[in-house]
Design a protein with these regions (language model features):
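Active-site cofactor/cluster-binding pocket
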Residues: 1-197
Length: 197
């Protein structure tokens, strides 16, 4: 079965874009897929838009960068504009729910898209620091090719040292992952032009 998934994630520095990309890449690799990730920072680096490219396949991946993504994630106002070049007709645009006006301004009503109120959920139910893990869970749920356990193992590898210092962080990250995963599963195979969670 042919499988090749191209994901671009973008947000402000500090929003955890690179961490989310590393975790999904690690989880994919552990699940037996070929996976490559490459970071791309704005010219300002600090204070610029951070973009991560992830490519996952059953076959060897020659380069993680691509011109059009299957899924493109935008987590900030500047990221909505920054990822425009990677959004094609069939691309699913996943974005922070508070960016609806920005998305409409840049993409109109034509783009397949999914608004996820990840920041609101993180602030109201958990902690703002797990905002990116909610988005990660949404990606895992939408795509359906990874098990939550694979992602939990990747989280352990990435954040295990922090979990050891504060065991509550593990539970918080696992809850955020599960919450995002549930949202993604509900929206799996999103085909409508606009979907709100």
């Amino acid at each position: 079965m042919d499988f090749n998934l191209k994901i671009a994630l973008a947000g402000e520095g500090g929003q955890g874009v690179q961490a989310a990309a590393e975790i999904i890449t690690e989880a994919s690799y552990r699940a037996g897929f070929q996976a490559l990730y490459i970071p791309n920072f704005g010219v300002e680096q600090r204070g610029g838009v951070s973009v991560a490219f992830v490519q996952i396949s059953r076959e060897p991946v020659s380069a993680p960068k691509f011109t059009t993504g299957d899924i493109v994630v935008a987590l900030s106002t500047r990221a909505v504009e920054r990822v425009r070049q990677y959004v094609g007709e069939k691309t699913l645009l996943v974005y922070e729910g508070g960016l609806e006006d920005d998305v409409r301004r840049v993409y109109g009503e034509k783009q397949r898209r999914l608004a996820v109120p990840a920041l609101f959920i993180a602030q109201e139910e958990m902690h703002p620091r797990v905002f990116n893990v909610i988005i990660l869970g949404v990606l895992v749920g939408i795509t359906g090719f990874l098990k939550v356990e694979d992602v939990q193992q990747a989280l352990e590898r990435q954040l295990g040292h922090k979990f050891a210092q504060d065991p509550n962080l593990r539970e918080l990250n696992y809850r955020a992952l599960a919450r995002g995963y549930d949202i993604g599963r509900q929206k799996q195979g999103v085909s409508s032009k606009r979907t709100n969670v």
